[in-house]
């Protein structure tokens, strides 16, 4: 799996990953475990219902988050305490009217915390998304539970 990090980090290429269902996520977890070593900001792109929140839940559970997790659609950010990585912040920027609203919620403090940040709808964040963030594009096949994730640096 270190090869994936090398490809993303040094070659600026992309990696595609197929998730057959939300019950079959071992490969997804394995890929992200290696990515946590070099990245803290993960931006999830996809249409409504593509599975952004569901995939983030799987990743949080793998990191040792216990208890309920939900999309922070109305609160913009949820904080989870993980057994393996400390605090994890889950952002849903869908309802932002202006990217500058991120300043009001302390975006810089979150970025400087060295915590893992999972961000849904990062396009709403404008220039506030760091250049070294990983971008995960989710393409969902709505006739099945299949999702194709494309990870780009």
Predicted regions and their residues:
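Short phosphate-coordinating micro-motif centered on Lys-Gly-acidic
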Residues: 3-11, 15, 61, 100-102, ...
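N-terminal pre-Walker A segment at the start of P-loop NTPase domains
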Residues: 7-31
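Phosphate-binding P-loop
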Residues: 33-39
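Hydrophobic anchor at the beta1->P-loop junction of P-loop NTPases
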Residues: 42-44
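P-loop (Walker A) phosphate-binding loop of NTP-binding proteins
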Residues: 47
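Conserved lysine of the Walker
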Residues: 52
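Short beta-strand-centered segment that lines the nucleotide-binding/catalytic pocket of NTP-utilizing
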Residues: 65-80
């Amino acid at each position: 799996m270190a090869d994936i990090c090398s490809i993303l980090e040094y070659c600026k290429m992309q990696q595609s990953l197929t998730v057959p269902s939300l019950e079959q996520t071992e490969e997804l977890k394995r890929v992200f475990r290696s990515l946590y070593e070099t990245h803290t900001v993960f931006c999830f792109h996809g249409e409504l219902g593509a599975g952004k929140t569901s995939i983030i839940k799987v990743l949080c559970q793998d990191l040792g988050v216990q208890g309920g997790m939900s999309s922070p659609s109305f609160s913009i950010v949820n904080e989870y305490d993980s057994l393996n990585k400390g605090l994890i912040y889950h952002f849903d920027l869908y309802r932002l009217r202006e990217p500058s609203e991120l300043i009001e919620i302390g975006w810089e403090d979150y970025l400087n915390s060295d915590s893992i940040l999972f961000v849904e709808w990062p396009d709403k964040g404008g220039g506030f998304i760091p250049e070294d963030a990983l971008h995960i594009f989710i393409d969902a096949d709505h006739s099945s539970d299949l999702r194709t994730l494309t990870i780009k640096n």
